[in-house]
Amino acid sequence: AKTDMENILISLGATNLGLQRTFYKSHIIAFFLNLCGIIKASLLLSPNDRLVLQYPLKKYYTWICRIAHLRNAKVITLVHDLGSFRRRKLTIPQEIKRLSNTDYIIALNSSMKKWLEEHGCQQSIGTLDIWDYLSNQISQSQHQKETKYRIIYAGTLNLRKNTFLVHFPQYINSFDLALYGNGNNLHGIDSLPHISYHGFIKSDELIASVQADFGLVWDGESLDGCTGSWGEYLKYNNPHKTSLYIRC
């Protein structure tokens, strides 16, 4: 999602002040490259610039906001995830205090906006509502009238995030469920009736090759409701895979 948003902003005339998003296995290399990008961005800011930051930005967020304000620039923060809500790496007051350094917040939806306001966020807040999904691939998916409906579920697979999948087969009779993702810790899930596991496939390959009718957005432990911290977070989050399913 962050890479897509970076490309969309550039297409709208924005300038990347730092370094383009790259991925390295070495944490040391990644740390120094991120630091170089942040220093570069800070030096290039001019008065009246609007700096868009994709949040969370780990340890550098507050520092960048302060540098931007020292240079008389405005900061717009696009929220991807709230660490205090899902991963619990921050307390809620800590996160609200951190976000108070920005001038404007783009929340994912009205529920996230309301949650931020109810917990003391006083910044102006707008909403994104749904992610754009960039891909040059053409979907080939078509439903065959003679076959059962096919549903796909994409994402990291583990008992903490999607235990509900273990209980799903007993309710499946009119459709098949295809699982895509890495970290399959749901042992034996692919041996259950009406379920197939296809491992990790890059999103562009999935769009070009998958044959399915619907995509499932659901997290948690229960089939009756999205429960647990992951399931509860869906009330406030717009999963990027929703846009992926639409793109397929």
Language-model-detected regions and their locations in the chain:
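N-terminal subdomain of nucleotide-sugar transferases
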Residues: 1-23, 167-176
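Active-site regions of enzymes building and remodeling cell-envelope glycoconjugates
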Residues: 27-34, 69, 73, 102, ...
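Extended catalytic core of nucleotide-activated donor transferases of GT-like folds
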Residues: 28-115
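Histidine-centered beta-alpha loop that forms part of the nucleotide-sugar donor binding/catalytic region
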Residues: 55-56, 79-83, 128-132, 180-182, ...
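Nucleotide-sugar-dependent
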Residues: 210-247
